[in-house]
Amino acid sequence: MVTYTPPAEAQDLPTKLKVLYFSNEFPTDDLSTLLRRLHSHSKHSSHPILARFLSEATRVLRNEVSQLRMELGQLVPAFESVTTLAGETKLRKGPLAQSIDGVLLCVLQLGMYIGYASHPLWFFLHCELYPEDQATETNSVLTGLGVGILVSTAVSVSTSLDDAVTAGVEVLRIAFRLGVFVANVSHNLEDVDAEASDSWAYVVHGMTVDEAQKELDDIQAKERTPSASKIFVSAISETSVTVSGPPSRLKALFRNYASFRDRKFAHLPVYGGLCHAAHIYAREDAQAVVRAPSLPARYKPVVPVMSTSSGQPFLASSAAELFEQVIFEVLTKQIVWDNVIRGVAERVAKTDVHDVNIKVFRHSLPAQQLSTALTSAMTDLPVDADDLLAWVGTDVDHGQYSPGSSMQSKIAIVGMSCRMPGGATDTEKFWDLLEAGLDVHRRIPADRFDVDSHHDPTGKRMNTSHTAYGCFIDEPGLFDAPFFNMSPREAEQTDPMQRLAIVTAYEALERAGYVANRTPATNLNRIGTWYGQASDDYREVNTGQEISTYFIPGGCRAFGPGRINYFFKFAGPSFNCDTACSSSLATIQAACTALWAGDVDTVVAGGLNVLTNSDAFAGLCNGHFLTKTPNACKTWDCTADGYCRADGVGSIVMKRLDDALADNDNILGVIPAAATNHSANAVSITHPHAGHQSDLYRQVMARAGIDPLDVSYVEFHGTGTQAGDAEEMESITNVFAPIKGKRRTSKQPLHIGAVKANVGHGEAAAGVTALIKVLLMLQKGAIPPHVGIKTSINPGFPKDMERRNLHIPFETTAWSRTSEKKRIAVVNNFSAAGGNTTLVLEEGPVRDRLGSDPRPSHVFTVSAKSKISLKGNLQRLIAYLEKNEDVSMADLAYSLTARRYHHNHRVAATATDTSSLKQQLISKLDGVDSMKPMPTTGAPPVAFVFTGQGAADKSMNLQLYHHSPFFRSQLESLDRLGQQHGFPSFLPAVDGSYPKDHAWPPVITQVAHTSVEIALARYWETLGIKPEVVAGHSLGEYAAFVIAGVLSASDAIFLVGSRAQMLESLCTAGTHKMMAVKASRCEIEDAIKDLPYDLACVNGPKETVLSGTTEQMEAVSVPLKEKGYRVIFLDVPFAFHSAQTDPILDLFEETARKSVIFRPPTLPIVSPLLGRVVFDEKSLNAEYLRRATRGTVDFLSAMQNAQETSIVDKDTVWVEVGPHPVCVAFIKASFDPAPVTVGSFRRGEDNWTTLAAGLGQLHTAGLPVRWGEFHRPFEASLRLLDLPTYSWNEKNYWIQYRGDWALTKGNTFYDAEKGINRQAAAAPVSSLSTTTVQQIIEENFSGSSGKVVMQSDLMQPDLLAAAHGHKMNNCGVVTSSIHGDIVYTLGEYLYKKLIPMAKTVHANITDLKVTKGLVAQSNTKVPQYFRVTATTADIHAGAADFVWENVANDGTVSEPFATCRVVYGDADHWLSSWSPLAHLVQGRIETLERLAAEGIANRFSHKMAYTLFGNNLVEYADKYRGMQAVVMHEFEAFADVTLKHVSGGGSYTVPPYFIDSVAHLAGFIMNVSDASDTANTFCVTPGWDSMRFARPLVPGQRYRSYVKMIPTDDDPSVYLGDVYVFQDKVIMGMVGGIQFRRYPRILMNRFFAAPDSSIAKSYAAAGGAGPAVSAPAPAPPVSPPKPAVVEAALQANPSASTPASTPAPAAVTAAPAVNSDSTSGKALVLIANEAGLEQSDLTDDAAFANLGVDSLMSLVIAEKFREELGIVVAGSLFLEYPTIGALRSWLEEYYS
């Protein structure tokens, strides 16, 4: 016992030694509670340093996680604070357990230390650790164990608590990397289930280190344990030792040997891998973990850190050196805690210490041992201890929270998309109209409301708009409903704002290169949506007319962003905000605030406005908001009198700038600050206030840290109102262009602009519209011209703009990026409700490419959700390549693969240059229709097959080793294992150091082969390609066993190397050979009779390998060659699977039995030795390896057994893992059809080229390739390209506002007007009246524009007779020729009204589209009205548009059913243009004449022609029967026509029967030709491209018509042709591009039934009878309630309503038996027959869309249901019940 006596001179100066002990274990308290309380304290005003530490720790950990390969990174859930990870139990038991626990221990101990040292009572702690004079030795020491000693280094190098934050997060980074590194190395020693809690260390009590070491040496020598797998002593104390090693070997040690089993022992909670292992790790490993720390040079060790091995302080001169020494000790040195105790005691003895204070994080055994030892060694020395965790238990004063600044990070905008007025369907078109200085206002389009009835410039009519103008998106109803999993019904009822929001969100994300969960910032849990919207027009007006299923989810605002979150699976918040005109920018500011606060990491934000409600126009007019003149906003004009309303939809994607840079995003612009305030002191709520606006600018500029004079552009709110413009100009000039005080220099010009002058005021979308404009300005380097000043500038604006250096750009002005200063802009957006929002925007940083991409070949992918879109995407990419021939192929591949969503219709191409790529894409475009989409059942299974020896060059140059850090680290780790086992390094054999024919000893060749395959398999797994079954060929089995978990990588390398050494020492190279024979086993036996040989391998039906002595093989080869079999001698030194290996078998088996551990396989293994699939652990052992060395490799039988047991099938994708694809040929030969096979490497080909081709195949097969991992090594050198966006398969989903109820609304104002209108209806507007144009009910003419509306009653006798003269299905049908006469009549009337001097009008009827037949009703006593509207904006443009609508008897107008355009022309010009064609057509007519004479073509008389026509489709009245004779061959014919004299029968401009007579030859061909299936189909025309006659059609005159109908490429059921009409061998008329579509004859009743008949009504009740000329498009399923017709059927048949007693089964893979007597059974048989399916195809999970049941087939089957089963259903039945199972269940429920 040493008695401690303080030195006499020290009595007056008591000195205390402070010892801080950092444990390697968590305290026994609940860790989550401790960290939660630590986090809570960090919010207190007294702990700003703690708050910064936790914030920085979170940031650093996120950064480290982002560097992990994807399969590991995705294990870490999204986290707002590192402290929350303590509760992630699954994470802390998984592969990253040691890394995460190391981080949490760092956070806990450093956080508690910082918090303790910051506390008012103990603030001096940290200062006391350090001497005031750095030359003086400190009276403090730092100790610790494991990660704890690493934590202590942060304290050692920090002279302040602020320094401790910086050093602490660096230590946290190292701790995380240490855990990952140790886990990776340990994984090669033993692949342990991370959740199995198998320990890598046991403590043994009562055993000395010498005893333990002797026992271990003896045991492991006897077992021949490979050196890398040996158990070793890792820690020593006086009473115990700790032994460490692979868990399975530790278990065996304590199970099998009494010297350990019989002592007291316990396993330690060490689950992450091995440390303190000098035989495993080296100095360079420590350097790899530490790398280059980012600490400044001033960080140096000040407080000594005691080595846990030597007990002496580490001697380091810098922080980096200290970190490296500590990590090296943790990895390689034994823990000898007694040495630490001794070292501290020595320090006490050497210094003038009066007492010792030990600081601990809760009391622990090592700290207690230290205290006890000091007390025992030195009597009378006071030793006390403080708990640094005690303070965290104190209550937090919630009144003194100080959350700190949330405005530290700038916000990057990384993607944008828009739909703007003026046809701006993308940002490029938007820029084009801005740059061109366009004002895109126009009259309110008809799809919104009838502007004429809802507009009154006098303002006298109630509820009308004073203006008829606005700025509008073209066809806002266009939408790709199936893409977004919406049915047509849901799409139609969903607000177009919501639809365009999700479309532009997708496009913005696509342009941002967004891929879900690719990086921490794109974690789905951390993404939210924010959209501004200020109206609900579509819900209030359009869908409100007939409220249905989707009225609420389709119309309520919250569902817009909610739908985006739901579709993309974003789990962050979704907000819809309304602040009136500032909605979008205020919402974007709110989204920025969420980013600044850390609530989310990625944001999709924007604004929405689509105008359909006339009320808003009326209300704004009455509130004096809107301009009365036809223009967009007259911003800054002296006559500005209000704004012009506008549509607008814009979406942007935002991230924090550091996240965007880390994600390698394109940064379109950066937001340093944004803010909102309110004009509280304005004279009225809607009036702006310059003072408050100026305050806002100063606030936001201060927040951004930017001088207002450095702003070079301001985007005004600029609505074009006198008050608003003047106030905003005043506020802007006061702050950004002042005349007093500091002013702008000549080099600081300020330009201003306002986008509303171009596209109007988008209201809720105005802010995002302005923001996108400025983003485009930054992108294009230009400021577009301002077009708002129509007359002269607002006189209230400053007269000294020049002195202020303030400029309005009246032409495009350069605004280029310079190196001198940033371009900075301000965007304003104000609210009519008083809010002001301002956002500062600056250009993004310039980023340099780091490194280069050496890959010579790249893979390019294109995908879509439909074939139409796939074609469009391919076409867009081809067009892009044509415009950008010098595009970087590496960038293009990266952008198309790693930065895009991948859908189920896929193509992939591998190319080295744009020309080659373009040709491949063109080729693939041609084959899209024949491509099969990915299966809906998910990705196909993957099998890895590992190549045997002999496939590679003797020396390899693996490009993957040089350029893939992961692959290289794997190979180097495996190479080190080999060296630890005593084998030479194999790296020179694979790194290209030697020529490819340089031979190596077998031990190097075979270890290299196995190691390359293990590393390659793991590389495939990082790319997302994971096997479900493995197979190995010969030597390849060892790598297969590693991947299947049977052997550790260490054991496999040991076995392969040992076997090779045995071959070298016990066998003679070159005495035996192996010979491949292109013949079957039986053929070989027949050919060589009794000659001796060994059957080495049976690889395929015709692939066999023999082995034997050299003499035997040469002898055997002779008869085989004589038989014509191909023979190849393999270049291998030893003949495996032959008698040559006999000398090594016993020794090898014994070595395998004693030295390695076999574990149960985690994957099925296809065993070529056993010829079957192995699942159990008993089959794979040392004896198996012996037999595999000598026995036959029966690869063929193994493959056949795998197929028979369904382990693999035709869908299995095979990846050959090896140096050259050999086995895939055997696999293809074993399967019919051949499966998809992919090689990894190929001799003579760059690795990247082979991998690119293989990944393309795997991608198109449907596997989820992790493209980000593939590009990761080169990402710093790659850039995201701004490629064309998705090509939508759009249809117009729109509910038209009908009538004028928005005006009347129950008021009495319009009662009198209605009476006047009724009187006016009785008195026609015009005297014009013909049979087809019976009454002009409205006409308006203004200058050169005009509108004429006619209404006719189909029941009028002459018109009804004309319809009945064209009977189909016994119904009178208005033929296209009647439509033609209407157009000729109205077209001439309109033209002459506007150009009264015109004498002759020649009209070309173009683009006629009839979407639904107009069929005469059967009740002739009730009117059947239809209406045609003709309009022209400018008659001098030579065109007018026509629209047909049905009109109900109550005046309700239905949706248009036909449209066309008239183009006025010159008859003489037409004649001259046709003249060159006449002889060509005449030549065809002469050919038909000759064919008729030869009996090849058919000749029909007048009567025969019309009899056949009537029998097959159309029964024509006599006056229509103008064809006198017809000659026809297949789809080509001519007819001689004489137009009939008809007396009476009505008045016409061009009689319909004249038009029909010369044109219906096309219909005759399609419905009579023997080339058509007229028995089962009929053909009708939906219209034509052009119809014109240069001369009048005259009764009694003779004409000749000719036409040839040709099927279209896109749809073989649609035919096109040009009808030429001759008079005297001159072409005088033509019907160009007349179209006929073929339909099943069964649909005749559905298409052509009198609208008041019972059958038509039943179709209407079932969902509509479908259009006459087109059918609904397929769409995704919905689950609506039972159809109304079914309800009626059930009421009529009560027994049918009884539900089936057994519910329909769940989806199964096999088709259930069909009960053909049941209704459901009959229905399925009917479906199978109609669709040409087998009963086996009708599995419950089979989707009708995948079975080829398209919209047309749906109509046919629905008709069959009605006819054969008596079930009336809609054609949409298969959308509502999209699978066989769903339909079966429905039928059984309602019809069983």
Curated annotation (Swiss-Prot):
This is Atrochrysone carboxylic acid synthase AacuL. GO terms for biological process: fatty acid biosynthetic process; secondary metabolite biosynthetic process. Residues 1330-1650 are annotated as: Product template (PT) domain. The gene is AacuL. Keywords: Multifunctional enzyme, Phosphopantetheine, Phosphoprotein, Transferase. Residues 1717-1791 form the Carrier domain. Residues 28-272 are annotated as: N-terminal acylcarrier protein transacylase domain (SAT). Transmembrane segments: none annotated. Atrochrysone carboxylic acid synthase; part of the gene cluster that mediates the biosynthesis of the tetrahydroxanthone dimer secalonic acid D. The pathway begins with the synthesis of atrochrysone thioester by the polyketide synthase AacuL. The atrochrysone carboxyl ACP thioesterase AacuM then breaks the thioester bond and releases the atrochrysone carboxylic acid from AacuL. Atrochrysone carboxylic acid is decarboxylated by the decarboxylase AacuI, and oxidized by the anthrone oxygenase AacuG to yield emodin. Multidomain protein; including a starter unit:ACP transacylase (SAT) that selects the starter unit; a ketosynthase (KS) that catalyzes repeated decarboxylative condensation to elongate the polyketide backbone; a malonyl-CoA:ACP transacylase (MAT) that selects and transfers the extender unit malonyl-CoA; a product template (PT) domain that controls the immediate cyclization regioselectivity of the reactive polyketide backbone; and an acyl-carrier protein (ACP) that serves as the tether of the growing and completed polyketide via its phosphopantetheinyl arm. Its EC number is 2.3.1.-. Coiled coil: none annotated. The lineage of its organism: Eukaryota, Fungi, Dikarya, Ascomycota, Pezizomycotina. The modification O-(pantetheine 4'-phosphoryl)serine is found at S1751. It catalyses: holo-[ACP] + 8 malonyl-CoA + 8 H(+) = atrochrysone carboxyl-[ACP] + 8 CO2 + 8 CoA + 2 H2O. Residues 944-1263 are annotated as: Malonyl-CoA:ACP transacylase (MAT) domain. Residues 1496-1645 are annotated as: C-terminal hotdog fold. Residues 1334-1469 are annotated as: N-terminal hotdog fold. It is an enzyme of class 2 (transferase). InterPro entries: Ac_transferase_dom_sf, ACP-like_sf, Acyl_transferase_dom, Acyl_Trfase/lysoPLipase, Ketoacyl_synth_C, Ketoacyl_synth_N, Malonyl_transacylase_ACP-bd, PKS_Beta-ketoAc_synthase_dom.
